[in-house]
Amino acid sequence: MGASQKNQELIGGLILFSAALLAIVVNNSPLASYYAMLETINVKLGIENLVIDKNLMHWINDGLMAIYFLYIGLEIKREIIVGTLSKPSNIITPAIAAFAGLAMPSLIYLSINHDIKVINGWAIPSATDIAFTLAILALLGTRVPAKLKLLVITIAIFDDIAAIAIIAIFYTKSLSLLSLSLGTLFILAMIICNRIFKINRSSVYVVLGFFAWFCTIKSGVHATLAGFTTALCIPFRENDKDSPANFMEDSLHPWIIYFILPVFAFANAGISFSGISFSILFEPITLGIIWGLFVGKQLGIFSILAVFKKLKWFKLGESFSNLQLYGISLLCGIGFTMSLFIGVLAFNDTHLLNAIKIGVVVGSVLSGFFGYIVLRFIVTNPS
């Protein structure tokens, strides 16, 4: 990660944090009625009977986040072909750690929440926000070795893959087979353009990907799946920045960190304190998310990394201290963007959404704060 990219990640993280803070301020000020317009102003896209009519909040969550998942897909594809994920020996331990970091928070959430009305939120504390995590790593600078940062990114990538699968399997509320079939045809068209006709024009995949996204929304499957699937169909060539996948990943990166994620944070992080009391912190759904993110994530990930290192199954881990591994395990508990996103998919009740937002913010802040403290002040030999 070069110096300019480190600065981008740091600035992007600060903008993301500022957007979330601004949302809370605006939603608890005289401007709250304008903030509410995110859910009352509708925008239509399409012609005649082929129309998608959604409010601004849905366009942000279904549209902008689909672009974000397109970017994630491009990043994962590059890592699989030429990056860390291209070597099986590099991915086994991070993959198992990521799974443990998904399972443990979910189990903690379910152990606290027994009411059938809130069980659907089990996946909320299982996510990791790579944007915030990279911002803190950039802030730590040389205190975190490059290989340790790579380990965090690899775990986060598997976390993203799991999140995509969870959204597709557990948060699809209705299904139109006709629309899904049409979307699949556009995906197949991209594969044919790539593998058979060797088409390298990015615009072709953008157009076909748009139609796949449109059909996916109409099908009832969440649109983020179309973004991720489209990324896997786009041609990638090693050492060629002009290949469609490289070009699109580089082009999207600043838009993701400076615009899409901050807009998502502003739209979804607006906790309204009107009519709620301090006791909301102690409601089962809030506690389940806080403990899931802050305790479950670090417990699941660190236990795997430490045990595998002890058994000498994790060669890369031998160059790190247990404190370093514990510090990055804490950082993986920053669930912010992805946790909020899953929360919005799981519930639409205003009170529950406020509890979710508070739980996500508190759990993420605790994880980020203590992760920073461990890596910055407690780890004595960062090299």
From Swiss-Prot:
It is found in: Cell inner membrane. The keyword DNA damage does not apply. Pfam families: Na_H_antiport_1. GO terms for biological process: regulation of pH. GO terms for molecular function: sodium:proton antiporter activity. The chain crosses the membrane at residues 10-30, 56-76, 91-111, 121-141, 150-170, 174-194, 206-226, 254-274, 289-308, 327-347, 355-375. Belongs to the NhaA Na(+)/H(+) (TC 2.A.33) antiporter family. This is Na(+)/H(+) antiporter NhaA. The keyword Transmembrane applies. One of its GO terms (cellular component) is plasma membrane. The gene is nhaA. It is a multi-pass membrane protein. Na(+)/H(+) antiporter that extrudes sodium in exchange for external protons. Its main location: membrane. It catalyses: Na(+)(in) + 2 H(+)(out) = Na(+)(out) + 2 H(+)(in). Keywords: Antiport, Cell inner membrane, Cell membrane, Ion transport, Membrane, Sodium, Sodium transport, Transmembrane, Transmembrane helix, Transport.
